[in-house]
Amino acid sequence: MCYKFYNIMVIKSLQTLVSESLKEIKTINADEAFQMVQDKNCNLIDIRESNELENTGKVEGASHIPRGMLEVYLDPNSPIFQNSQIDQNKEFILFCAGGVRSALAVKSLKDMGYQKVSHIDGGFGSIASSKFKII
């Protein structure tokens, strides 16, 4: 008897990836993030693309690491590790435009071994309507 095995590729949707990530990561709101920034207990990291910052403004006090470079910049073995820009002893709070990319990014950082990471629900949209200053 001969058996044929077929490789069937299963593609997960973006919504599935985000839903799975949200079950494993810490989500905070903009007011909680603002208080942590005021208390100097975190690294606020904007993972939006440069053109997004140019179009909508920057969040005062946030470091900018584009989503596409996040793992490279935060890999201690990378030649462009951003150790001087980021305090490794403080929580990383990530945000993007709406919260999708930051949820996936936080999951990725957790997979890399980072423990104190969270993202802001609603991203820049919720930040812009909070106490944060947009410059």
Predicted region positions:
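Rhodanese-like catalytic fold shared by cysteine-dependent sulfurtransferases
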Residues: 2-42, 50-91, 100-135
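Short, surface-exposed ligand- or partner-binding patches at beta-edge/loop junctions that are enriched
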Residues: 95
